[in-house]
Amino acid sequence: MSQNELTTGDFTDEHEPFGLFETWLTEAKASEINDPNAVALATVDESGLPNVRMVLLKDFDQNGFVFYTNFESQKGTEILSQKKAAMCFHWKSLRRQVRLRGEVEVVSDAEADAYYQTRPIGSRIGAWASKQSRPLESRFALEKAVAEYTARYALGSIPRPAHWSGFRIKPLTIEFWRDGKFRLHDRIEFRREALGQPWNKVRMYP
């Protein structure tokens, strides 16, 4: 996609954020080298100190943006404590960015179970073996845990650990950014006062 194609077309005419996000994500899937669903996830600890890391978006709809993790990890404990988070998608191939922030809820057990069973066997075993975000004495200790859980679940299905599930970020703001010449970028932000309220669209200075 050429620079001219990237910066033509007025996406700022859109009046609803989820449809626009779906369009941009679809285009990113065609242009990004890998992981077009990779997103920076920001959380804060009890002192207000932020943490950020990359996760993979696994689902989204009008209700929000879903990813899965170990609830005993740093991000898991911070989200369960604060009930808020932010995300930032950056697609370099498209020169586009989407930022969002909002309230967070835990997905249903049915949703988590369904997604968990789609994961490779090694990933399901890893969810049991890894005490995510806690000190690890050696690589051997991790590999030993993997071997132990592999043997335990050699026959039959691998159940989802109680500490492993998904979060849904229900955005209160979603901002779309597109690169422009001379740093004169295009930015629009969709805002709502509360969940369930209508969106208000604001064009922003770059």
Curated annotation (Swiss-Prot):
It comes from the Bacteria. Pathway: Cofactor metabolism; pyridoxal 5'-phosphate salvage; pyridoxal 5'-phosphate from pyridoxamine 5'-phosphate: step 1/1; Cofactor metabolism; pyridoxal 5'-phosphate salvage; pyridoxal 5'-phosphate from pyridoxine 5'-phosphate: step 1/1. This is Pyridoxine/pyridoxamine 5'-phosphate oxidase. The keyword Hydrolase does not apply. GO terms for biological process: pyridoxine biosynthetic process. Keywords: Flavoprotein, FMN, Oxidoreductase, Pyridoxine biosynthesis. Substrate binds at residues 58, 115, 119, 123, 183-185. One of its GO terms (molecular function) is FMN binding. Binds 1 FMN per subunit. PROSITE patterns: PYRIDOX_OXIDASE.
